Amino acid sequence: MSAIVDIIGREVLDSRGNPTVECDVLLESGVMGRAAVPSGASTGSREAIELRDGDKSRYLGKGVLKAVQNINVEIAETILGLDASEQAFLDHTLIELDGTHNKARLGANATLAVSMAVARAAAEEAGLPLYRYFGGSGGMQLPVPMMNIVNGGAHANNSLDIQEFMVMPVGAENFRDALRCGAEIFHELKKILAAQGMPTTVGDEGGFAPNFKSNHECLQIIMKAIEGAGYQAGEDVLLALDCAASEFYKDGKYHLSGEGLQLTSSEFSDYLGNLADQFPIVSIEDGMHESDWDGWADITQKLGKKIQLVGDDLFVTNTRILKEGIDKGIANSILIKINQIGTLTETFAAIEMAKRANYTAVISHRSGETEDSTIADIAVGTNAGQIKTGSLSRSDRIAKYNQLLRIEEDLGDVATYPGKSVFYNLKR
């Protein structure tokens, strides 16, 4: 038995300089697991609750001392002595202890920090790398990365309404080459922007944040960077967008202020479809407002056979909402963010439900990250096939890519990289 003998929560900083929660879990053997939780900027209204102090005299009200206190007192009193290897039992204990449908009492940032730290401790105790602890001998597929090389929307202070413009190196033979491909495109894009007198400062997720005139112009420049780096768009590299449409949906219309457009749901579906006809776009995330289910039905009907339509704010890693979407034929993919739901067990349940329904699952970071690389291990352990963890800069993003390199090295010849086949539910 891997009995938990001590648990310590603390307030640390994330990549935006805002407080977040870190947790240490100590086992009877002396083994320790440590984990830190991320935080989002554009958030779905149905996400599990991130508990903040609200004390304006500390960190502008964003302190997390209440969540830390919940770990050090109430959660500690409940889980001390429990077996760390019983992840599902421990997570359900946390869920029941909280007693709300959205972790509002203890805070999802408290429950997730504990859940992750327990898993790390148990893996260490078992002498297993974390990805192997999660997935057993079956976890051997490296994910295709969605690399966010241009930031807009809530992630940057510029004129772009679409939040993320990403490249996906689907033509690579392995993850190592995919990472190199993304990095070379990133640096080529930097050269192009500098040559045009545009700023090469980066946004929250490490991508560039220039003031392009339109989404179309941004995509054209990215295509130029792909070619300049020596790759073929549409073959070696595909494109992906995160619209974060909930951020610019007002009064029943989609307001693309950077382009002076106000579009209905159907018109915005057509707008995105037109972009996909002009550029090799394979994935569109949150193409509709989280509550615009009629809009989601429309875009799924129009684009769902050829484009991966990812629900982030739509599904918030919640199996109850995902099941409703599956039953109604809404979207065809789910974004998996561990802090949207607050425990690893619930996270794995969402991934499994998606796979059973022939939906893809994309493991994701948040815009406020830490050096914690757990999501890299989750991506491989669950054979999710895709990961979204930012650009090719900022150490909080690179930490995940570097962990995936280590995992690929550890797996050796049994490691696989799916490339285009990861879009198994599309007809392209």
Swiss-Prot record:
Subcellular location: Cytoplasm; Secreted; Cell surface
E.C. number(s) listed in UniProt: 4.2.1.11
Main location: cytoplasm
Annotated catalysed reactions: (2R)-2-phosphoglycerate = phosphoenolpyruvate + H2O
Keywords from the UniProt entry: Cytoplasm, Glycolysis, Lyase, Magnesium, Metal-binding, Secreted
Pathway info: Carbohydrate degradation; glycolysis; pyruvate from D-glyceraldehyde 3-phosphate: step 4/5
Entry annotation: catalytic residues: E205 (proton donor), K337 (proton acceptor)
Family membership: Belongs to the enolase family.
Name of the protein in question: Enolase
Source species of the chain: Polynucleobacter asymbioticus (strain DSM 18221 / CIP 109841 / QLW-P1DMWA-1) (Polynucleobacter necessarius subsp. asymbioticus)
Taxonomy of the source species: Bacteria, Pseudomonadati, Pseudomonadota, Betaproteobacteria, Burkholderiales
